[in-house]
């Protein structure tokens, strides 16, 4: 099956968003260490919101990025 240009762009954009999301998750891994001096619940909620990005209604065309605590 041949894909349209729009479908291909959507795939590329989706991968770009996932790459950014994964980078943000990796950068915030340290916040989940038991003795990290941060609000772990707030950071856990932020990290869950990052994981949920692909479930947003307009993904990948419009993405609302969560704000770091």
Regions found by a protein language model. Give the residues of each.
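A preference for well-ordered globular domain cores
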Residues: 1-69
């Amino acid at each position: 099956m041949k894909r349209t240009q729009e479908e291909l762009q959507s795939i590329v954009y989706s991968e770009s968003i996932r790459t950014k999301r994964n980078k943000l998750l990796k950068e915030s891994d340290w916040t989940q260490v038991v003795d990290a001096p941060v609000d772990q619940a707030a950071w856990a909620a932020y990290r869950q919101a990052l994981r949920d990005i692909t479930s947003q209604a307009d993904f990948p065309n419009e993405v609302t990025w969560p704000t770091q605590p």
